[in-house]
Amino acid sequence: MIFFVNEDQRKTSGSTCYLEFQKGNYNDKCWLPDSISIYCELWDEHNLSDLFTHVVKDFDYFGTTKISKKQWKEIVKLSKESHQIWQEIIAEADLWVKECFKEYDIFTIIGM
């Protein structure tokens, strides 16, 4: 992966400055083995909060945000209609999200 890291890679980095994509509902535990994460500076550099808040009005950069299947489809669509970099980042996450949605109806983004 180019934009996202798995939990082993995040742990090796020694940093917690990541937004974590976690399968299902957040249950008071971070950095799960099947999560993916994106470095906060990369998120900020590409203004990904703008993309997510366009679809998820209550997106919380510093808290937790649930993303439904319907919302994800809208995020994917908007990313394709907007910036090329958004499309690339979302396409990379989409592989993980599709696997998540086989088992769960939502995933949670755990912010800073």
Give the role of each language-model region:
Residues 1-106, 112:
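Acidic (Asp/Glu-rich) sequence patches and key acidic residues
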